[in-house]
Amino acid sequence: MEVRVAGVRKEFARFPALHNVSLTIQSGELIALLGPSGSGKTTLLRLIAGLETPTEGMIFFGDEDASQKSVQERNVGFVFQHYALFRHMTVADNIGFGLKVRPGGTRPSTAEIRRRALELLDLVQLSGLEKRYPAQLSGGQRQRVALARAMAIEPRVLLLDEPFGALDAQVRKELRRWLREIHDKTGHTTVFVTHDQDEALELADRVVVMSQGRIEQVGTPDEVYDKPNSPFVYGFIGESSTLPVRVENGEVWLADRNIGLGAENMPDGDAQLYFRPHDVELLDGCGGCIAGTVIASRRSGGKRRVELEVGGARERIEIEIPAEHPAAEKSRIAFRPRYWTLFRAGDSELPAPKAAATT
């Protein structure tokens, strides 16, 4: 089922939670709505579900305008962060609940509801637990039951609101792999909300990065990580280091130093340089590079994280270097980013012409 959000605006007591949001979700896609608190991601999910109605704009399920239709009319499955299972019902009864409460003409028989519940328990790898109650399950098992319940009604769209947020890190990691496998088996159009970038990048076919009620970027995990189109996306997805620089005649300057990066297609003026701390090339010395004084160094797994003062001690950045590097305090380190992006100073939406990787 294709879902299309067209020019949607949502206000709560005149507070704009979404600003003119448009998005097309292809049939069978697994989409992540990713952003910090207050970005509008949960509001967008609730609008797709029918739990909220848009102030302006329309929401289509296929060619059908679903903007004013209820959750039941849209036939969506919804999975909440805290499971929302009925404590007094067995696992099988929880899964079959959505089918049991259907109107008489569309309600399956008791035997069919049980068959469907057992079938889904097998799919979510919980066979044999149908007679247990939610209190007798682990958090990960409860979330699997919640997903099975959402799928029992054979929804046109499956929606998940931070489904793993209440679980510990190891369980979340296991359930991410499991959810991707379930999606590939069933082919549901699936939208999930998360603030966890690792979760979004690992699970989704495409990631919708949101900030302050707007969509900043939509792309594959590789696209939003490798080609972020705004300072916000660069800073939010993965780790980043940034320096205020100046562009003059196609060259990039930090304070009074030409740092050896070309910006031929960018107009002269102030800019912001972004790069990943691990994507740097260490240099023995250079006439055009970034050089700094070590003010802190710490071991982090197989690497070493180093904090440097650069630009005449006016700026501080972090880079990641091999663990065996001594990086003594007050020593000098020279480096150049391998991959980097320039944004015009003060530009929060669109990138300046982007430089290629250095060599």
Curated annotation (Swiss-Prot):
UniProt xrefs under SUPFAM superfamilies: MOP-like (SSF50331), P-loop containing nucleoside triphosphate hydrolases (SSF52540)
Keyword Translocase: yes
Sequence similarity: Belongs to the ABC transporter superfamily. Sulfate/tungstate importer (TC 3.A.1.6) family.
Pfam name, any one: TOBE_3
Protein name from the UniProt record: Sulfate/thiosulfate import ATP-binding protein CysA
Catalytic reaction list: sulfate(out) + ATP + H2O = sulfate(in) + ADP + phosphate + H(+); thiosulfate(out) + ATP + H2O = thiosulfate(in) + ADP + phosphate + H(+)
Keywords, comma-separated and alphabetical: ATP-binding, Cell inner membrane, Cell membrane, Membrane, Nucleotide-binding, Sulfate transport, Translocase, Transport
Principal location class: membrane
The protein's Enzyme Commission number: 7.3.2.3
Subcellular location as annotated: Cell inner membrane
Molecular-function GO term, any one: ATP hydrolysis activity
Complex and partners: The complex is composed of two ATP-binding proteins (CysA), two transmembrane proteins (CysT and CysW) and a solute-binding protein (CysP).
This protein's record includes keyword Acetylation: no
Domain ABC transporter: from-to ranges: 3-237
Chain's role: Part of the ABC transporter complex CysAWTP involved in sulfate/thiosulfate import. Responsible for energy coupling to the transport system.
Source organism (scientific name): Brucella melitensis biotype 1 (strain ATCC 23456 / CCUG 17765 / NCTC 10094 / 16M)
SMART domains tied to this protein: AAA
